[in-house]
Amino acid sequence: KALTDPAATAALAELDAVLIGGGPAPRPILDAAAAAGITVVRTYGMSETSGGCVYDGVPLDGVRLRVLAGGRIAIGGATLAKGYRNPVSPDPFAEPGWFHTDDLGALESGDSGVLTVLGRADEAISTGGFTVLPQPVEAALGTHPAVRDCAVFGLADDRLGQRVVAAIVVGDGCPPPTLEALRAHVARTLDVTAAPRELHVVNVLPRRGIGKVDRAALVRRFAGEADQ
């Protein structure tokens, strides 16, 4: 929202950097910030790691990163908590010196590379034997000129297990794009498996307290509706 306010944009541009976290930032927002002269640094971390410990994909000194089988991110090192006072099962601290997160990611060049956070494991969509993460699909949809905001989620499907569904907010003055147009747009950069099979146009996306899209609310809203 600050990028739509000239005074706020100018104030942010005077800072050394603006730290963002909580999930992957949409490319249009990053591009708009860069065009306004705002230095944006993407942070990654959680309470168990004493907050942010990876900045623009690069871990702080003393922080270790691994990507486990299945793609989950594991974090170790000096900033890591010893564990939970009341451990849960399975315990993400079970491996000594490491915390197994619920996030999926990739390291560019082995365990010493730059980390890319792909999304949450519990948000992955299993469709036709393939796994689709919402965030890369949202990033692709967000580059369509008619899409101002979007969210991707999975709905139960008798044939596929789950189908990929998109909810979009249309940009001011733009005609709503068709499902076919958005599928073709996504397929330019991702496998066609990731392209949405169902489209909903909404006025606003539901969000939780800290601003994250509430995918569960979208699932509840659109479950059982026919394809559009």
Report residues per predicted region:
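Short beta-strand-to-turn element immediately C-terminal to the catalytic PLP-Schiff-base lysine
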Residues: A2, C53-G57, L68, G76, ...
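A short, polar/charged loop-to-alpha-helix boundary motif
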Residues: F222-Q228
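Conserved ATP/PPi-binding loop(s) of AMP-dependent carboxylate-activating enzymes
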Residues: P59, L68-P96, S112, T127-V132
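AMP-binding/adenylate-forming catalytic core of the ANL superfamily
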Residues: G77, L104-A194, V204, A217
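Flexible lysine-rich "adenylation lid" loop at the C-terminal edge of ANL adenylation domains
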Residues: P196, V202-F222
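Hydrophobic/anchoring residues in structured secondary elements
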Residues: I20, V152, H200-V201
